[in-house]
Curated annotation (Swiss-Prot):
Residues 1-17 form the signal peptide. The keyword Protease applies. The gene is CPYA. It holds the Pfam family Peptidase_S10. One of its GO terms (cellular component) is fungal-type vacuole. This is Carboxypeptidase Y homolog A. GO terms for biological process: proteolysis. Glycans are attached at residues 210, 509. Residues 18-124 form a propeptide. Disulfide bonds join 179-419, 313-327, 337-360, 344-353, 382-389.
Amino acid sequence: MKFLTTGLLATAALAAAQEQQVLQAEDGMGQAPQRGSSIFDETLQKFQSSLEDGISHFWSEMKTNFKDYLPLISLPKKHTRRPDSEWDHVVRGADIESVWVQGADGEKRREIDGKLHNYDLRVKAVDPSKLGVDAGVKQYSGYLDDNDADKHLFYWFFESRNDPKNDPVVLWLNGGPGCSSLTGLFLELGPATIDKNLKVVSNPYSWNSNASVIFLDQPVNVGFSYSGSSVSDTVAAGKDVYALLTLFFKQFPEYATQDFHISGESYAGHYIPVFAAEILSHKNTNINLKSALIGNGLTDPLTQYPQYRPMACGEGGYPAVLDQGTCRSMDNSLERCLSLIETCYSSESAWVCVPAAMYCNSAILAPYQQTGMNPYDVRNKCEDMASLCYPQLNVITEWLNQKSVMQALGVEVESYESCNSGINRDFLFHGDWMKPYHRLVPSVLEKIPVLIYAGDADFICNWLGNQAWTDALEWPGHKKFAEAKLEDLKIVDNKNKGKKIGQVKSSGNFTFMRIFGAGHMVPLNQPEASLEFLNRWLRGEWH
């Protein structure tokens, strides 16, 4: 996850000038954000009288620093769309939407719910021998197209290595916002990694060992995805994910009958409550959603931000990164930070949520980032900030940018990048960063189990914060869950049986795990442990 700091004030998106809708309201984004200071002046004048003095001052500074010709949304990627004739399958959402059936009550209804007429799904059967990635495993890649909005989401599907006719299906989402899920594929939990010589190396701990896995580049303009428009908030992105899954399972009904689980890490702590709620809101669907998994996520900033100081100052199980003076400074800044987040929670307006993110990230996160330590792993220095402290991302990017790879996958953009900073900025300046998406979790828990897991060496979405928000969440099982004690989590599935890999607590449909010796990306640091808890979770343990 990339956290922007106040150094990006001058690049604020005018998207924030449009009032945001409260959570669960209808999506009313209106026209695309414009360039220039005139609309900024007009909108600022409209809202400034209702803002607190500090927040009003923030936006006044924005106006002063604003540049007329600054790009205000992430720029579209160069691309060439392949004709439908080059794809093995094309699924039309309009065809699905036109199918009506007779319900149990005798009334006619659509077979599958949702607005789908504007979506198509293009599918290519990938030849594993051309890429050397999990040879012998059935694979598909392609694009979900929103033809009305000119949006095109790339996906790559791997069938289970074990028993694909019966094994569950898992969707994997990386965070950012703006980071490609193909980084998760090749850096963390996919069937292969890429070595420094650009050779494909098999991963024995891949999550498709006992499940079929879909890696999705979302929102648009992330990874191999592209668009002439943009998505700048989590709710809008959820509509696309629902459409992708619906059309994919329509094309491949053999997977639709199996259990489906949605998973991800980092900013997926925002995505997954919204995406799961979107899927569960549809009564008639072909998505057999059974659970949700969030790894080292940002879900409830109001509860998580107070835990940054303890994690950085030696109270999270690892030596302190910051000196006592800096720790005291973070303590002194916390009250103002939490006040701003509370105001954001109350209004869910970009006018107050953006200042909350900017102030808190500057006062609470920046002191750690200035040390040169890896924000994703408190044990290590940051090797290369340009590659998010993981130089292997450069190798993965180089491999994915090979013409032979792009041709084999049916890619339509000219180049791949692991993370798009423009998307990160767009979400931040739409106020999405600090919004209370955790409020959707109780309704999700009513219908499916949820697992929150956290590597305990991560700073940026640390285990202390994730434990805190899960304990604080208001839901019918709150008291029992909060009172439950962490118990040892040990390996039971292989030759290392009995090895302690973490701690776990569970009550009702809610489970929290602390994974020892893992940073932000648990499958990267502890691949054996991650596959262990995944397999057991998919089998129904802890729920």
